[in-house]
Amino acid sequence: LDWALYKNFVEEVDITAQVVNTTLSSDDIAYFSPKMKDWHLTLTDVNADVSGPVADMSGSLRSVRTGADTKLSVDFAAQGLPDVGKGHFKADISELTTSAADVDRLAAALTGKNLPDEVLRIAKNAGKIGLTGKFDGTLTAFAADAALATEIGGATCLLQVSSLRDGCRGVLGDVKTSSLQLGELLENDLLGPLSLNVHVNGELSSEHSDAEVSGEILRLGINGYDYESL
């Protein structure tokens, strides 16, 4: 055993492990990886196979729980940890269930920022959230394919986000909803169920947004009436 490698634990020490019905704390791992010291996350019911160093890890999480409502099953590969902001991730999510409160707490732990108030409010209105899908990229440039299920309706999304010039990001995507209870989501009594197909092609930055949006509203409830093929 070469103890000198532990001075560069994140890049040099290979981890090969099978975890069964285990509880893990980021505070313990932070002893070897100080960048995780502010995460303060506890994972329970962990069943996983993991291999590689922290900076280039892959594996299968058959189950893991955190917070009050979050459960995850996923095959994954991650490069660049523990620097989440610069890391590259691949994930094939077979099950993810969570809630607004858990997402807010995870966002604060991993990025140092809570969700914006409006986003948090809308997420709470959705109730319990379920997700399956695939992700490949960084947190700011990625391709994703997801199916979302909530207590007030569902949606599917194909999304590609790319880095352009001067901090701009290109956004290309297709979104479909089926009987999404829009009024409950936005707290607007005039709105009812929404089913639509939308294609988006645009650019986003901290200073401006510009997008072409096309699609079809298959169904929209307004003031108690359902309108179709708008």
Describe the predicted segments one by one.
Residues 1-17, 34-36, 43-54, 61-65, ...:
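Extended lipid/amphipathic-ligand handling interfaces
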Residues 171:
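Short beta-strand/loop motifs in extracellular/secreted proteins, especially
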Residues 21-27, 67-69, 97-101, 141-143, ...:
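Gram-negative outer-membrane beta-barrel proteins
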Residues 25-30, 39-41, 52-57, 109-115, ...:
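Flexible, solvent-exposed coil segments and beta strand-coil junctions
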Residues 6-13, 103-111:
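Acidic Ser/Thr/Pro-rich low-complexity disordered segments
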